[in-house]
């Protein structure tokens, strides 16, 4: 087996490792001890809860908008993204977003180390959530 200790798993809607860090983040993949080669996080947010512009030095980030309207900034570029839209934000470039919707926004975000040598020490977004947030739920049957 190439990935000792790693087992396949499936999660139903609403399942995952849910951490509260101001808002609830549900980690679908990438939680501690499960081989962080990528992270997939689902969360709901609203206008006024946007993170400040920031930079990830070692990981690329992808957003898929499940519901809502946002304006993403990445360096000098801006992208108007709505329901079903996708944006890729490469490492090393300052980025952020502004919510344009009056209602809640639901997002899927994927982060992954952009360089193979970064994987060994990569904690990424999930490690930040684990450190700052309170674990409120774990999926049944996933050890």
Residue ranges of model-derived segments:
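A short, N-terminal "cap"/entry segment at the start of jelly-roll beta-barrel domains
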Residues: 1-38, 132-143
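Short acidic-glycine-tyrosine-enriched beta hairpin
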Residues: 12, 16, 33, 69, ...
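Conserved short histidine dyad/triad with adjacent acidic residue
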Residues: 24-27, 41-56
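Tight coil/turn sites that cap or link beta-strands
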Residues: 46-48, 84, 92, 102
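Short beta-strand segments in beta-sandwich/barrel cores
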Residues: 49-51, 63, 68-73, 86
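Short beta-strand His + acidic residue motifs that chelate non-heme Fe in jelly-roll/DSBH
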Residues: 53, 72-73, 89, 95-101, ...
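A generic "binding-loop/recognition-motif" signal
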Residues: 58, 77, 93-94, 103, ...
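Double-stranded beta-helix
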Residues: 100-143
């Amino acid at each position: 087996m190439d990935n000792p200790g790693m087992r396949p798993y499936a999660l139903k809607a609403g399942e995952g490792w849910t951490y509260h860090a101001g808002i609830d983040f549900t980690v679908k993949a990438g939680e501690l001890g499960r081989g962080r080669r990528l992270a997939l996080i689902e969360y709901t947010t609203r206008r006024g809860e946007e993170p400040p512009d920031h930079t990830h030095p070692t990981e690329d980030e992808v957003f898929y908008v499940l519901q809502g309207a946002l304006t993403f900034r990445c360096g000098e570029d801006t992208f108007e993204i709505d329901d079903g839209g996708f944006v890729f934000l490469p490492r090393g470039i300052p980025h952020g977003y502004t919510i344009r919707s009056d209602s809640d926004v639901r997002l899927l975000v994927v982060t992954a180390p952009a360089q193979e040598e970064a994987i060994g020490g990569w904690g990424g977004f999930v490690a930040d959530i684990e450190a700052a947030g309170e674990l409120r739920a774990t999926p049944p049957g996933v050890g």
